[in-house]
Amino acid sequence: KGVKPENIITQFNVIQDSLEIWVNDPKPQPDTFYVSVRYMKTDTLGMLNSAVDEFKLINPNRKTFGKSSKKDIKHEDTTAVVKIEAAPETVEQYGFVMEFKYPIVESAFDSLKFISINPKQEESAAGYTVTQDTVNLRKYIVRPKDKMQVGYEYKLKLPHRKFRDINGFYNDSTEVKVS
């Protein structure tokens, strides 16, 4: 109640038994949310019927603005955390997998640098495609446009401040290399 539907991001897990909810609104939010969930429920006769359940969600980790030591603040608390993985033996099939800790609300995938390095160690820009995972909205797959060549190394560079997560934090630069 009180949050516009366009400011809510939801995602089910793989087996569809858990729902993750994020509020995409920079304004301070209350520590308690009341959520109405409308779904199809099986009754005692095995028939599907529309049902509405109300849930009270309390944030047990709500951060209070008090005195906190700078020692308590970790780097992950102030940046959009992204993990990039690529296995050399499967990178051609599965690509470079980028997974953000939280949903991103601003992105600049055209700023990625995909570089091929030939056996003479000469670098050249290579084309790539980006697709969002169909199950996990925080995961993106970066694949080369051209067939990968034997003996070449490939590097994916993510420049800093090109992606902003739902918490308002920007990413750090990172680089992953496979051969």
Stretch-by-stretch model annotation:
Residues 1-179:
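N-terminal targeting or signal-anchor segments and their processing/structural boundaries
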